Design a protein with these regions (language model features):
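Surface-exposed, charge/polar-rich loops and edge strands
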Residues: 1-118, 130-208
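Compositionally biased low-complexity segments enriched in histidine and/or tyrosine
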Residues: 124-130
Length: 208
């Protein structure tokens, strides 16, 4: 039993983890190895890292209605260097891929909407930035309780890599909001039929 627990500690960790503080790993990141990251970089894919300390509330089932569900606050960090790379990509019309729902929530929490003026609120629905494109601001340990549900306007993230999630979870609501409900239902039905693995150590999907 101790051997299994020790092995799990190694397996339940991304190769790029640096800062302690989360109660769970960003499981979409478990699919990435050092060699895969090196291969992506060799293909001139920009790989940037952000931090969001996942709290236990993320996994709290939706008890009543989707609309009334609340998320607990979680601390997150986006360096100025990373924000600059993302903003340059947005300016150039490049696509931003988020690895995991935690990354998406952090980026959308720090999003500033491109418009004529203003500084933005950093909640995903900010005022204008003075640019013709959406941007993300640097964040140093602020908290977010952003709950992504149908109707959310995605300002930064264009594509998402994510695992298959539990029913009645805020994570599944986020995924269905990012794609659309019918597409996600179809994907999950196919995953069940083909016996894909679900949850933390499971398979992942790419939503373009």
């Amino acid at each position: 039993e101790d051997f299994k627990r020790g092995n799990d500690i190694d397996r339940y960790q991304t190769v790029f983890a640096k800062h302690p503080g989360a109660v769970a790993a960003p499981t979409a990141g478990l699919h990435f190895s050092d060699s895969l990251l090196a291969e992506l970089k060799a293909m001139q894919v920009y790989v940037e890292y952000i931090t969001l300390h996942v709290g236990a509330g993320t996994f709290k089932p939706i008890a009543d209605s989707v609309e009334d569900h609340k998320l607990e606050s979680e601390q997150f960090y986006i360096s100025k260097e990373t924000a600059d790379v993302i903003n340059k990509a947005k300016e150039n019309g490049s696509r931003i891929f988020a690895v995991g729902t935690t990354s998406l929530r952090a980026l959308e929490s720090a999003a500033l909407k491109g418009a004529d003026s203003g500084t933005g609120s950093g909640t995903g629905t900010g005022a204008g930035t003075g640019t013709g494109y959406n941007t993300v601001r640097a964040v140093d340990g602020e908290s977010t309780s952003l709950y992504v549900q149908p109707g959310h306007e995605f300002l930064i993230v264009d594509s998402l890599i994510t695992n298959f999630h539990l029913a009645r979870s805020s994570l599944l609501v986020l995924v269905a909001s990012f794609a659309d409900r019918e597409s996600i239902l179809k994907a999950y039905n196919e995953a069940v039929e083909r016996r894909y693995r679900f949850f933390s150590y499971g398979d992942a999907m790419l939503i373009l």
